[in-house]
Amino acid sequence: ESAARFPGLASRAFIVSCFGKTYHVTGWKVGTVSAPAALTAEFRKVHQFNVFTVNTPMQVGLATYMQNPAPYLELPAFYQRKRDLFAQGLAQTRLKLLPTTGTYFQCVDISGVTTLSESDFCQWLVREVGVAAIPLSAFYGDGFDQKVVRFCFAKQDATLLAALERLRKL
């Protein structure tokens, strides 16, 4: 849940959102930051030197898109269907599914498939199988390797089905 739902946190939190994932337009790399005025004033002091601007067509397109809330409100069911499709397909592989909720990533345990590290497995998977995954160890400062990788299911169904077909052959 968002920190904005908790009064004690909302008054001192930055809420960061990505249009790309939220509105299923991955790759657009446009987002928002919401926070109390005092916090955003400080945030803008730093942000102005990190990011110059977002191109105008993206801003206009997103502003127009956001005027109709229906597509946004349909996204939970949209992503649930994709998660179910991908998880059901992964269940037919040797990869062990790990519980996921509230995300567009499916984590899997690879220990039953390989002795490679997460990172080496992901590199091998792209080169030899043609499927991309991210090693969870990439998110740890010490590279902690749990033999867990994540797949993004915020993709076209055809892409997911092609990936599943390849993963079944592992």
Spans of features found by a protein language model:
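PLP-dependent class I/II
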Residues: E1-L170
